[in-house]
Amino acid sequence: MDMILYIPYDFPFVMDEGMSRFISQYVDGNYLEGYTWKMSINGLECTNCQSPEDASKRDLADFNQIEISGKFDLRILRQDHYSVELNGPEHEKEQYTVRRSGETLIIDFNRNKNFDWDVKGLTLEEMKITITMPTIEKIEAVGLGNIRFEDFTSDDLEIEVRGPVKIRGEINAHNLIIKLTGKSEADLSGNTNNLNARIEFASRLRAYHLQAQDAFVEVSGASSAKVNVSGTLEMDEGVASDIDYRGNPQIIRHD
């Protein structure tokens, strides 16, 4: 027996998987139970399904770590909501993949992972990126550019930078871990109970305005660090490297 079902235009209805099989138009199985549909002159339409843009915004939330590569000017703002905005030429945007993996927001430059970011006259255009998030626990950056953040409070924060990237920020953290390599620079202010810094390969840490209770600082490969410590400062200075300090700490030197 053949049967034709007529549905008035703009009349809302719901359907299950069985009903969807009788409809010639493609229906996404993820939008059956709990979703409302209507028939328009353009065909079947879902009235409460998420648009691809809404789904993308939903996916780019609930992160507390950032992993970024490329040539960028990144600003991280403390807000109660999550957002990610890339501003730059479309042909440059196409070279980046933005996604979330667990609690990590990943902004990945799609070219060769062994790209030499220290090449003079690099022709890549800078991507301006703004991220808002409530808290932050880790920043990992590879490439060339600038990172700025301020007014964050964390139990633990890890900053790892590889390549000629300059990072500037204000942070209050119980434990702060810093790893700089490959001509990277960090200028930090705020407060921390425990600072652990490893600076190498012509990198620089400027942290006179970061009040640290205790610190372990290791520099090597023509690198330098300036720190402000009031308790115990453990120092490991390599060849052609230098650690300057303020705060009258107890010094423990490692050979």
Labelled PLM ranges:
Residues 233-255:
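Leucine-rich solenoid repeat scaffolds
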Residues 1-13, 19-160, 170-179, 187-196, ...:
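Acidic (Asp/Glu) and glycine-rich low-complexity loops/linkers
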Residues 206-210:
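Outer-membrane beta-barrel transmembrane domain signature
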